[in-house]
Amino acid sequence: MNGFTNRAQLLSKMRNGEHLDWDIIVIGGGITGAGILREARRQGYKALLLEQQDFSWGTSSRSSKMVHGGLRYLAAGDIKLTKESVQERQRLLKEAPGLVDPISFYFTFRKGKFPGRIAMKIILTIYDFFAGAQDNRYCNNKELLERFKGLDENKLQGASCYTDAMVDDSRLVLRVLQDSIDDGGYALNYTKVEDLLLTNGQVSGVSIQDCDHSELIQLNAPVVINATGAWADRLRNVVNSETRIRPLRGSHIVIAKSLFPISDVMTFLHVDDKRGVFIYPWEGTTVIGTTDIDHNEDIDIEAGISDQEVDYLLKAFNSQFPSNTPVSYTHLRAHET
C-alpha cells in the first residue's frame, strides 16, 4: 500500500508542464467516481480523479449506511434492477467484510394494512433467490416484542425477517480509492474543475484550480466523466443546458442508544404517507430515517434538516412505541442529511 496521491507534488509537476495528458479524467470523489477510477486502472488507462472537497464529502458520506438489495424495486416490479442490486450487495459482502456487514431487518405487519405476510413472503422469496440463499422467515409477536421493547401491540401481526447489509460509506470510498491508487491511479481532493475544455464542440479536457486559488491548470483527456452526483447539471450545462438532475434530500435523526437500544433494523410504513421508515443501530447510537423531499437550496452549502422533517421522523417513531417515553427534540443527539 503506497498511500494516497501526494497532491502537492502532483500539482507542482502539473504547473511545470508534467502530467497534463490523461486517458480518462473522472470528476467527483464519491463512490461512483472512485469505482470508475478503479475500473479505469484495471483496464490499463492513465486515469485521474478530481474532487472539489474532501473525498466522499457529498452523498457518499451522508447515506443511510445501508447496502440494500433493492427490495422496493422488486415491490415495484423492477426485476432486473433488483437482481443487479442483490448481486452487487453479495459482492460487497464478500469483498469488503468489516466495511459491509449483514444485518437483520424486521418489517412489521398490522392487521388490515398492506403489504401483508403472504405478499411479503412472495417478495422476499424472490429476493433471496437472487442472492442464492433463502434466509427470510416469519417472526411472531413474542420475538418481535422482545427485540423491540415497547412496540405497539395494537393489530400487530408479527414481522418478516430478512437480511440486508450496513456499510461504513465513507470508509468504503476510501478503500476503493486506495485500491485505485495502489494500482497506479491518481486522485486529487480540494481541486476544483472550473471549466471544461472543448475542441470542435467536444469535451477534450478540464481547467482546474487548487484550493489555494492559484493559477488555472489545463489538463487534456479524450474522455472526461462527470461523476459529481447532485452537481452533475452544473458541470454538464457547459455543453448542454438541459436540466436532468432533481436534487433530493433524505434526513435522519439520531438518539442515544440508551434511549432505545437495538441491534437489528426495524422497518415499517409511516402513518401519514406510507413511506418506509427505518430504525437502526449505528456507531453506538440509534438512527431514525429517512425523509425524501426536494432540496431547493444551494447545493454548495451544507444541507440541514428542517423542523418539519424532524416532526415527521419523531411522529414515525412515537407512533410505533406509544408506551415508551415520547422522543422529542430534547432527546436528539444529531440531525443528519
Across the structure, where does each feature detected by a protein language model lie?
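Conserved small/polar residues in nucleotide/adenosyl-binding loops
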Residues: T330-T337
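Glycine-rich FAD pyrophosphate-binding loop
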Residues: R42-S60
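Core beta-strand elements of the Rossmann-like FAD/NAD(P) dinucleotide-binding domain
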Residues: S214-V223
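N-terminal Rossmann-like FAD-binding beta1-loop-alpha1 element of flavoenzymes
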Residues: I24-L48
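Flavin (primarily FAD) binding-site architecture
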Residues: N226-V239
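Dinucleotide-binding Rossmann-like beta1-alpha1 core, especially the glycine-rich loop
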Residues: K65-R147, V277
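Extreme N-terminal leader/targeting segments of oxidoreductases
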Residues: M1-D23, E39-R42
